[in-house]
Amino acid sequence: MNMIMAMLANISISSCLIIIAFWLPHLNIYTEKASPYECGFDPMSSARLPFSMKFFLVGITFLLFDLEIALLLPLPWALHSTNMFLTTLTSFILVSVLALGLAYEWMNKGLEWTE
């Protein structure tokens, strides 16, 4: 009997929440809410508007450095391996490549936003 009551309670609460979820959005309809929004750009305008190349380059640089950092995440588990020298050498090379890439971007003023 308790199982049936629990199922009925769950079904009734779920049904009420579904009805409320479909009913609430229809109360306040504004033009701003109905319009699509994508990264601050108007999606109905021309798709060939120029954008900042600096923004694109900083975004690509962030993506590359983020992927390199993601390669370092399994490092604590790799330190428990039997060949400690190879693990340490690999992590040192990875961090060195990351540091050299950062130094290269810094020297070529790739990280400066205004220019």
Curated annotation (Swiss-Prot):
Segments passing through the bilayer: 4-24, 55-75, 84-104
Catalytic activity as recorded in UniProt: a ubiquinone + NADH + 5 H(+)(in) = a ubiquinol + NAD(+) + 4 H(+)(out)
Protein's UniProt keywords contain Electron transport: yes
One Gene Ontology CC term in the entry: mitochondrial inner membrane
InterPro entries reported in the protein's UniProt record: NADH_UbQ/plastoQ_OxRdtase_su3, NDAH_ubi_oxred_su3_sf
Coiled coil spans: none
Membrane topology: Multi-pass membrane protein
An MF annotation (GO) of this entry: NADH dehydrogenase (ubiquinone) activity
Broad enzyme group: translocase
One biological process term in Gene Ontology: mitochondrial electron transport, NADH to ubiquinone
Subcellular location: Mitochondrion inner membrane
UniProt keyword annotation of NAD present: yes
Family from the record: Belongs to the complex I subunit 3 family.
Assembly with partners or alone: Core subunit of respiratory chain NADH dehydrogenase (Complex I) which is composed of 45 different subunits. Interacts with TMEM186. Interacts with TMEM242.
Identification of the protein by name: NADH-ubiquinone oxidoreductase chain 3
Organism (species): Phyllotis darwinii
Gene expressing this chain: MT-ND3
